[in-house]
């Protein structure tokens, strides 16, 4: 899929952070982009950056939204970035409601959209990318069920890939696990929480993380992934400022 011209790309969670960078990168590469998010002003600002971007104001966790948009646009590229901000507290200060926030959003979004991608199904050769998190591998003790929800997203992506293979659908599904970054709401919350937990300033904590992953870097990395030969793609990748890396 080296030429993205005319290949409709739906980016779910495109209004800010990495999702915004991904939407802009695909639009600049010539793809007609459908940017999905709940925030009207942010979507309008994004759409003003490129004639290739159109917007859909919707709740990504609503199953009818997933069905409607997959049916209407029949995307050849589907990128799932949307999710909830975790409640940053130690385990003992969580309630079940705060602990499970990401189970009811991030996991539901991955399940709902992947289900629709398989049921429609998307056209043969389509690519689906689920943006999970590095927390899926490393854990995140100050964010309740966040890391577990991201690990489950990774599993669901692998399940969807297997179902595509079994049914001969030709859809490639991949999980991408970005490292914590200050260029998004979740990352900023995490940086504040873990800096305080370690008795550091935010600047000190950021410094030990190394070069931060930017929205532009994320966009470039996902372009490379979508353009790659499906036969060379593995089920999941870590994403840092250095690009996509296979988990060790």
Model features per residue range: what roles?
Residues 29-45:
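Conserved glycine-rich Rossmann-like NAD(P)H-binding loop of the short-chain dehydrogenase/reductase
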Residues 71, 105-126, 161-162, 166:
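Amphipathic alpha-helical dimer-interface segment in Rossmann-like NAD(P)H-dependent oxidoreductases
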Residues 92-111, 129, 153:
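Catalytic Tyr-X3-Lys loop
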């Amino acid at each position: 899929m080296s030429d993205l011209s005319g290949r409709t790309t739906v980016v779910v969670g495109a209004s800010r952070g990495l999702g915004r960078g991904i939407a802009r990168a695909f639009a600049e590469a010539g793809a007609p982009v459908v940017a999905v998010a709940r925030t009207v002003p942010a979507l309008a600002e994004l759409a003003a950056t490129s004639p290739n971007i159109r917007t859909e104001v919707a709740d990504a966790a609503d199953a009818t939204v997933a069905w409607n948009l997959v049916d209407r646009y029949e995307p050849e590229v589907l990128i799932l970035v949307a999710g909830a901000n975790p409640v940053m507290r130690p385990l003992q200060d969580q309630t079940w409601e705060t602990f499970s926030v990401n189970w009811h959003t991030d996991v539901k979004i991955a399940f709902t959209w992947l289900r629709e991608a398989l049921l429609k199904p998307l056209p043969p050769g389509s690519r689906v990318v689920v943006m999970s998190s590095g927390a899926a591998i490393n854990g995140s003790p100050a964010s309740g069920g966040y890391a577990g929800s991201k690990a489950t997203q990774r599993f669901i992506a692998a399940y969807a890939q297997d179902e595509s293979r079994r049914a001969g659908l030709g859809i490639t599904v991949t999980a991408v696990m970005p490292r914590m970054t200050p260029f998004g709401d979740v990352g900023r919350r995490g940086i504040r929480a873990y800096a305080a937990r370690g008795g550091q300033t935010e600047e000190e904590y950021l410094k030990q993380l190394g070069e931060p992953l930017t929205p532009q870097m994320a966009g470039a990395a996902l372009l490379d992934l979508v353009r790659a030969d499906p036969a060379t793609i593995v089920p999941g990748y870590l994403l840092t400022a250095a690009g996509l890396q296979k988990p060790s």
